[in-house]
């Protein structure tokens, strides 16, 4: 049985796509968005930064958004609601609630033990390890779909998950594989 008690995960970034279901006049929107940039010759949307919650939004005339930099799903919801309130002040009409779809969550974490990455790479299926190019094992989980970067220190980065539950499940699958191939050292009692 895999022991997850020492595993720590922290959200570093969430990316979401949002549909406001309304067309936007970006020339008007740029006037009400502080900390924003709009140069249609370079990019077809507004790049807007909120300080609270601390996120960046890409706003398109189709009413579609990309929100990035969030540390929680609640931050995304707060940012979208804040933008909607701002848009209402310039006459934007909303017929329905926005649709928010999480596209990617990135977690950093620590498994709480060290690993011989050469042994991991030789034993584990679905992984890549080229230490001359990158100092970690790249482990791909098929279901839930995620990619875990495993470093010799036991530190990990998990990306591609669409929920916190999926990230934990992906890490659980990695640990099961490590255990299955005898790559998890049992804690040995130190003798004094």
UniProtKB/Swiss-Prot annotation:
Key words of the record: DNA-binding, Repeat, Transcription, Transcription regulation
GO biological process: DNA-templated transcription initiation
HAMAP family: TATA_bind_prot_arch (MF_00408)
Family: Belongs to the TBP family.
SUPFAM superfamilies associated with the record: TATA-box binding protein-like
Gene: tbp
Entries under Gene3D superfamilies matching the protein: TATA-Binding Protein
Function: General factor that plays a role in the activation of archaeal genes transcribed by RNA polymerase. Binds specifically to the TATA box promoter element which lies close to the position of transcription initiation.
CDD domains in UniProt: TBP_archaea
Cysteines engaged in disulfide bonds, as pairs: none
Sequence repeat start and end residues: 11-87, 102-178
Protein name as catalogued: TATA-box-binding protein
Residue ranges of coiled coil: none
GO MF annotation list: DNA binding; DNA-binding transcription factor activity
InterPro entries, per the entry: TBP (IPR000814), TBP_archaea (IPR033711), TBP_CS (IPR030491), TBP_dom_sf (IPR012295)
